[in-house]
Amino acid sequence: MEVLQQLGTYYSQNGGYVLQEFYRHFLMSVYGVLFAAIVGIPLGILIARYRRLSGWVFAVTNVIQTIPALAMLAVLMLVMGLGANTVILSLFLYSLLPIIRNTYTGIISIEHAYLESGKAMGMTKFQVLRMVELPLALSVIMAGLRTALVIAIGITAIGTFVGAGGLGDIIVRGSNATNGTAIILAGAIPTALMAVIADLVMGWLERALSPIKKKKGNFIIADRKTTSI
């Protein structure tokens, strides 16, 4: 109970600071994933077209995933210095694998009949991609973005070690303080809530964008232009 009282007191006295760091934490996470999506989605489409490249691309992105986050930040800090940009670049690198993998999987798993129908209607390769493949693969791509964002929120918490701020800054302050359990919780609880809410929202978007929806025990094709081909 004493810890809860201390936690409530901390929030009442430092609510503005916590909100500021929450916002900063969220923005860094989103920027890292957004930049990874800008690169990763086209790259996933490319290796779905030229599958010989997939082994090399996945090998590189898998190696990146094996590097501890703190070590990655330390290396990038030597190049980019302290600050949020170092964290965003780190998040960009860690977010590539789930985004590329899900884009690749979503594209190659589309039934060949849909592609042939598009070609039979006189669509160009780009039109087939834009009007058939991407809409049908969108829910799978969203699943990759969902995974990447949740991972990014967790990694951003250690960005405080390179001067990036965020909720990790509150956690570190608590770990350095005497009887700082309440301060640690003041940073850890919003971080966990952010990850849970992001996962729920992205999960809802993933289901909403799925071309196959479940209704009354039966699977039906969603009402989408691409599925009418």
Curated annotation (Swiss-Prot):
Organism this protein belongs to: Bacillus subtilis (strain 168)
Complex formation: The complex is composed of two ATP-binding proteins (OpuCA), two transmembrane proteins (OpuCB and OpuCD) and a solute-binding protein (OpuCC).
Domain ABC transmembrane type-1: 22-202
Gene from which the chain derives: opuCD
Triggers of expression: Repressed by OpcR.
Function description: Involved in a high affinity multicomponent binding-protein-dependent transport system for glycine betaine, carnitine and choline; probably responsible for the translocation of the substrate across the membrane.
Cell compartments where the protein resides: Cell membrane
Membrane topology summary: Multi-pass membrane protein
Protein name per Swiss-Prot or TrEMBL: Glycine betaine/carnitine/choline transport system permease protein OpuCD
UniProt-listed CDD domains: TM_PBP2 (cd06261)
GO BP annotation list: amino acid transport; transmembrane transport
PANTHER family: GLYCINE BETAINE/L-PROLINE TRANSPORT SYSTEM PERMEASE PROTEIN PROW, OSMOPROTECTANT IMPORT PERMEASE PROTEIN OSMW
Transmembrane segments: 27-47, 55-74, 78-100, 148-168, 182-202
Superkingdom of the organism of origin: Bacteria
The entry's keywords: Amino-acid transport, Cell membrane, Membrane, Transmembrane, Transmembrane helix, Transport
Family: Belongs to the binding-protein-dependent transport system permease family. CysTW subfamily.
SUPFAM superfamilies for this protein: MetI-like
Cellular-component GO terms for this entry: plasma membrane
